[in-house]
Amino acid sequence: MHEGVQVSSKLEQLQDLLAPVVVALGYQCWGIDFSSQGKHSVLRIYIDKEGGVLVDDCAIVSRQISGVLDVEDPISTEYTLEVSSPGMERPLFTIEQFASYAGEQVKIKLRSPFEGRRNFQGLLRGVEEQDVVVQVEDHEFLLPIDMIDKANIIPTFD
């Protein structure tokens, strides 16, 4: 999904440009994801607010973000803009988000193998500095956050 430093700096640029727009509209910018599949790319912006996000909220943010993107033109290729709530399978982007969801089940995919594997599914134990602590069966892994390509909460229904 991500192609190393180039995509990482592109994400930082998009975050710096778009997060203030989302916040100014009264929403939390939960995270931004930019993925390329061949000739087509997708820019996903996850928004959140107290009480949840409705379709109308996504439309409001999408219109404002589209205007900023049209003026600033930070993406040189063709892309689709998607604005949504993080949903039940909430993606995790920051060390603070990982810390706040300690105790939840997570699915994590790394950019490159760590201890012989790229995929981890288990209990999110918390964070230690810039490492995410995940327990998979009887083994605990400290995964450097900068190695994480994608992470999501696995919803449980009690």
From Swiss-Prot:
**Where in the chain are disulfide-linked cysteines found?**
none
- Keyword Hydrolase: yes or no? no
Its family remark reads:
Belongs to the RimP family.
Write out the annotated subcellular location.
Cytoplasm
One biological process term from GO is: ribosomal small subunit assembly
Looking up HAMAP family in the UniProt record yields:
RimP
Q: Name one Pfam family in it.
A: DUF150_C
Protein known as: Ribosome maturation factor RimP
Q: Which PANTHER family match?
A: RIBOSOME MATURATION FACTOR RIMP
Task: Show the InterPro entries listed in the entry.
Answer: Ribosome_maturation_RimP, RimP_C, RimP_C_sf, RimP_N, RimP_N_sf
One Gene Ontology cellular component: cytosol
Q: Which gene encodes it?
A: rimP
